[in-house]
Amino acid sequence: MTNTRVSDLEILEKRYPVLVKQFSIRHGSGGIGAHPGGSGSIRAFEARAPMTFSLSSERRTHRPYGMNGGGPGKSGRNLALLHLPDGKKRWANVGGKGIVKLQPGEQLYVHTPGGGAWGSLEEARLANGIAEKKHQYWRGTGSLHTFAATQNEG
């Protein structure tokens, strides 16, 4: 699984003894600037059998830099939610590279870094008279969206 390709979660769950608990946009992780950095993602996996994850990720220590005055993106992080022998749970930072062994019910959270921004936000505001630049996300419309929204209401 990579950060550049979105694999089908159903295939992942079929091939490996893992349950995908979360796969979402990491809002606010992109750098601030005239052209904001892209958002990272959050992926959470729960082991359904004893298993080993091999991690090879970057930008966990050093944040993705911005260019031409743009702000840096947020760094990524990899966390494991482990079960202790006394029944308690403990969060562990597993770093950017290495091996993580999980027992059934334990979880691995992968927060990918946000992208660095390009261009100074202050200069863009002065040049364009823009009060504030916000991320815009696609919103569904039309009959299919209305049908799906109706099905999810009750």
Which role does the model predict for each range below?
Residues M1-G154:
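Glycine/proline-enriched, intrinsically flexible loops and inter-domain linkers
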